[in-house]
Regions:
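Conserved MFS/SLC helix-loop-helix module at the cytosolic interface between two early adjacent transmembrane helices
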Residues: 67-104
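Helix-loop-helix hairpin linking two adjacent transmembrane segments in secondary transporters
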Residues: 133, 142-190
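C-terminal transmembrane helical hairpin of 12-TM major facilitator-type secondary transporters
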Residues: 272-318
Length: 404
C-alpha cells in the first residue's frame, strides 16, 4: 500500500460535524462584511461620519480580515484548530463590543480593525477545513449559498432593525452570536490542521507552484468582478435604465447568486472543473456584452443576473482547483484574503480609469481579468494532475517489477 502524506497525517477524514461547525463559524465571520454597504450609509447618517470616513472604516474591516488570514497562517503550525477558533472568536467579541461602544471615527476604526482581524482568522480556518472535505467544491457550494442567503436577508432586514433599535444593536447581536459560536469549537479537531511536512516547511517557497498559480488566479479573477460589480448601478443609468429597474436588478441578483452557488456549484464533485470554468466564463462574457447593449429593464435584469449567476457558480469550481493544488489546505486558507484584495483592487483600478475611458472600461477590465484568471486556473489544474499521474506510473512500474 502506498501511504501518502495525507493518509499519514490524517488517518481518518474529519467528521461531517467538523465541516458543519467550520462552515457555521465562517458564515458568522462574514456577517459584518455582508452588511458593509448598509453600514457605510448608516455610519454616515447616524454616526455623523463623512462619506470618506465611513469608507475608511469599511476598508479597515476588509484589510483587517486580510491580516487575520496572515495570523491564521502563522498560528496553524503551532496551535490546534480548536485553540485557533477560540482565539479568533474572542477577538471578534472584543471588536464587536468595542464597535457598539464607539463614540467617534478613531474609536470606530480601531474597533473594526480588531473585529475584522478576528473574522479573518475564523474565515481562514473555515476555508482550510472545507478544503479537507470529501468533495471540497460541494462543501464550498453549500457555504457560498448560505453566505449569499445571509447577505440577502441581512441587507433587507438590517436597515429597519437599525432604524428601530439604533446603530449599535447589530453589533450587540453579533456579540451574542459570536459567544454562541464557542459552543461549536469542541466539534473541531484537537490536532494541528497541517501535516508534519507542511509544519516543517514554511514560507511562500513551500507552496506548490500549482497552489501559487491558483491563488494568483483567484485574485485576478475577483479583481475583474470587483471592477464591474461596483459600478452596476451607474452602468444601468448609463444605459438609460429607470432607477426602479436598476434597484430591482440589484435585488434579484441575490437569487441568481444563490441559484449559481447551490444549483450548479453543488455539482462540483461530478463535473470536470476545467470544463465548468470555461463554460461559465463564456456565460459571463455574454452577460457583460449584454449589460452594455441592452436598452430595457428586463434585458438589464437578465444580463446582471447572468453575470452574478456565473460568478457565484464558478467559485465552487475555483475552490476545487485551489484545494487540489495543495493537500495541506494552506492555499485554501488564503482564499478570503485573495478574493478580498482582488475585489478591492479591481474596484480601485476601475475608479482610476473610468473618468478617462468611461464606464465601458469596467466591462473590458472584468472580461480581461476573468479570461486571465480562468487561464491560470486551468494551468494550475493541469500541474496538480501531473504528480498524480507520476505516482500512478511509479505504482505500475513497482507492480510490474513484483510480478516479474
Amino acid at each position: 500500500m502506498i501511504m501518502t502524506e495525507s493518509t499519514v497525517a490524517y488517518p481518518t477524514r474529519p467528521s461531517n460535524w467538523t465541516f458543519w461547525a467550520a462552515g457555521a463559524l465562517g458564515i458568522l465571520a462574514t456577517a459584518v462584511a455582508a452588511i458593509l454597504p448598509v453600514l457605510v450609509g448608516v455610519w454616515q447618517k447616524q454616526a455623523g461620519l463623512q462619506v470618506d470616513q465611513a469608507g475608511f472604516v469599511a476598508a479597515t474591516e476588509l484589510f483587517a480580515q486580510v491580516a487575520g488570514t496572515g495570523m491564521f497562517l502563522w498560528a496553524s503550525p503551532r496551535w490546534t484548530l480548536r485553540t485557533i477558533a477560540v482565539a479568533g472568536l474572542c477577538v471578534m467579541v472584543v471588536g464587536n463590543i468595542a464597535t457598539a461602544g464607539s463614540v467617534d471615527f478613531a474609536s470606530l476604526m480601531v474597533a473594526r480593525g480588531i473585529g475584522g482581524a478576528g473574522g479573518g482568522v475564523i474565515r481562514a480556518l473555515c476555508m482550510m477545513s472545507l478544503a479537507k472535505a470529501l468533495s471540497p467544491g460541494r462543501a464550498f457550494a453549500v457555504y457560498a449559498g448560505a453566505q449569499v442567503g445571509l447577505a440577502a436577508v441581512t441587507t433587507a432586514f438590517i436597515p429597519h432593525f437599525i432604524e428601530t433599535q439604533g446603530v449599535r444593536a447589530p453589533f450587540l447581536v453579533l456579540t451574542l452570536a459570536s459567544a454562541l459560536g464557542f459552543a461549536l469549537c469542541p466539534l473541531l479537531p484537537r490536532h494541528s490542521p497541517l501535516p508534519p511536512s507542511a509544519i516543517r516547511q514554511r514560507g511562500p517557497a513551500s507552496y506548490p507552484m500549482a497552489a501559487i498559480l491558483a491563488i494568483v488566479a483567484l485574485c485576478v479573477f475577483f479583481a475583474g468582478q470587483g471592477a464591474l460589480w461596483t459600478y452596476l448601478a451607474p452602468i444601468g443609468a448609463y444605459r438609460s435604465i429607470p432607477a426602479a429597474g436598476v434597484t430591482q436588478a440589484l435585488t434579484l441578483l441575490n437569487f441568481a447568486g444563490l441559484a449559481g452557488a447551490l444549483g450548479v456549484g453543488a455539482m462540483a464533485h461530478r463535473v470536470n472543473p476545467r470544463i465548468a470554468l470555461l463554460t461559465l466564463l463564456a456565460t459571463e462574457i455574454i452577460s457583460i456584452v449584454g449589460l452594455f447593449r441592452v436598452h430595457s429593464p428586463v434585458g438589464f435584469i437578465a444580463s446582471a443576473g447572468a453575470f452574478y449567476f456565473s460568478w457565484c457558480a464558478s467559485f465552487p469550481f475555483q475552490f476545487t482547483v485551489i484545494s487540489q493544488s495543495d493537500s495541506s489546505g494552506r492555499a485554501s486558507a488564503v482564499v478570503p484574503a485573495a478574493d478580498g484584495l482582488g475585489l478591492a483592487g479591481g474596484a480601485a483600478l476601475a475608479s482610476v480609469v473610468l473618468p478617462t475611458l468611461g464606464l465601458g472600461s469596467a466591462g473590458w477590465i472584468c472580461a480581461a481579468a476573468s479570461v486571465a484568471g480562468i487561464t491560470l486556473y486551468i494551468w494550475s489544474a493541469t500541474l496538480s494532475k501531473m504528480p498524480a499521474r507520476s505516482m500512478q506510473r511509479v505504482a505500475a512500474v513497482d507492480s510490474a517489477t513484483l510480478e516479474g
